[in-house]
Structure formats: structure tokens, C-alpha cells
Amino acid sequence: MGVAVKGLWNIVLSGYPRSGKTMLAKRLIAENQYFARIGVDELREMLFNEAPPCRDEFLVYSMIADMRDSLLEKSYSVVIDSTAPDNITRQFLLTTRRKRVNRLLIMLNVDREVLVERNIEKFGDASAVVAWDKRWQKPVGDVPIFRFKSNSMEEFESYYARLKELLESEMHPFKPEFHRFPMPFRDVREALKNLLKKRNP
């Protein structure tokens, strides 16, 4: 059954590897013909065939922003499938050139032991979890957040039903008039560029 989304959405997924981000993103676009997914890891691999951080992370994120804004201009809601571990990256992905867009940061919450088990099953070890621990930040500021638990398929389905209800709602606390952009897009872009330079000199 499809999702009858109300309004235009820019949704950013943030979560550890194997937390269910891609499954959620693909579910959203499968159930709504006016949703489009941008996969950060897939774009990075397509351009450079490299794991993060690749040789030009700023180019990757600049292209993501351009694709996002082009899709929004064509009246497609966007879901950005990313790890987005820090607040500058989250803010960059949430800040659109187009106004009157519902912004939403979905934090994928999975218990650590479940994350470790899934990563060992997929990659053979839990090094990815440890690596992202060093960069992970709690969200701050006036950021609309939906916390999505995904420890099991039953829990995933329960939270997906809640998310679907939100997206179909006429009135919700994530409307653009209830939130201000803390910085213009140009300034957020510069902040991300500086962050990436420090991380990958």
C-alpha cells in the first residue's frame, strides 16, 4: 500500500552501517512514486570506487546537494541515504535552496549488540561500528528529528507505520514555518568544506 505524502519533503537518514537506512529509503520510494532516493555510498563508489573518505568527499556532497535541489524543483520529495554522523553534514544535507520544504532528520536507532552482530555477519568484523563511534555526534539545534528504531523487522514495521502516518498528515511539527534555517546554504556549504579539509588534509 502506497504512502499518500502531503507536501514536499527533504528527508535525511542518519545511522550506523547495518542500521536499516537503505531498507527504509527503498521502502519509501517503492511506496510513493513522487519520492526519489539519493545513495551517498553508491555515488561515491560510482565516481571513485572508494570507501569513505574518498579522494574528493566535498565533490560527492556537492553533487548530492545539486541532485537533491533538482529533484525538489521537479516536485519530487527526496530521501538521502547516508551515514551523516556529524551535525555539519546533517545540516548541509537538510539545507535546501528551495524554500517551503518539510525537513526531517531520521535517526536510525539500533542497540549496539545488534549493530555489532549485523556488521560481523555482513563484513566479518565490527570495525565499521568502532570507526563511526569516533565521529558520531548527537543532534543539536533546531533540527526536526524522527527517531526510528530498527532492532528487528517487527520494530521496523511499527516505526515505519508511525513515519507513514506523519508523512500523510496535513498538520505536523515538521512544517517549514515552524523551523528556521540556522545558516544560509552558502555558509553551511563552507562549513562542510572546512570540516572535510580538517578530516582529510
PLM features: residue spans?
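NTP-dependent small-molecule kinase module
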Residues: 2-6, 141-201
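Walker A (P-loop) ATP-phosphate-binding motif of ABC ATPase nucleotide-binding domains
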Residues: 10
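Hydrophobic anchor at the beta1->P-loop junction of P-loop NTPases
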Residues: 13
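The conserved Walker
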Residues: 16-17
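Conserved glycine(s) of the Walker
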Residues: 20
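Conserved substrate/cofactor phosphate-moiety recognition/catalytic segment
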Residues: 23-76
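Acidic, metal-coordinating catalytic cores used for nucleic-acid/nucleotide bond scission
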Residues: 80-90
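A glycine- and Lys/Arg-enriched "phosphate-lid" helix/loop adjacent to the NTP-binding pocket
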Residues: 97-151
